[in-house]
Swiss-Prot record:
Location of this chain's protein in the cell: Cell inner membrane
Pfam families per UniProt: Oxidored_q2
Name the record gives this protein: NADH-quinone oxidoreductase subunit K
Enzyme class: translocase
GO BP annotations listed: ATP synthesis coupled electron transport
InterPro entries: NADH_UbQ_OxRdtase_chain4L/K (IPR001133), NUOK/Mnh_C1-like (IPR039428)
GO cellular component: NADH dehydrogenase complex; plasma membrane
Organism, scientific name: Rickettsia conorii (strain ATCC VR-613 / Malish 7)
Amino acid sequence: MLRILNMNEYISLNHYLILSSLVFTIGMFGLFMHRKNIINILMSIELMLLAVNINFVAFSIYMQELSGQIFSIIILTVAAAETSIGLAILLIYFRNKGSIEITDINQMWG
């Protein structure tokens, strides 16, 4: 007879929180270490948002509440839209100026 495993028996809330804090720390480290390249900054911010989503889903499972998972889906959707718009703006800027360095973007004039 096949036994259906309950994932909460093997993976506790602490495991999810440790994973989330590690992903957030990697994102924060990437944000501070790669301040020159805007693509790396966007990827680091996405990692930090992913860590927040892991927290939402973990607490949603722990509390047996569906709202955390719904918030996570909404956050992922909005983050994907923001990233696509940001990359489109960067692509147009790169075509015009030839560089996407932070120092060059700070010197933009009307």
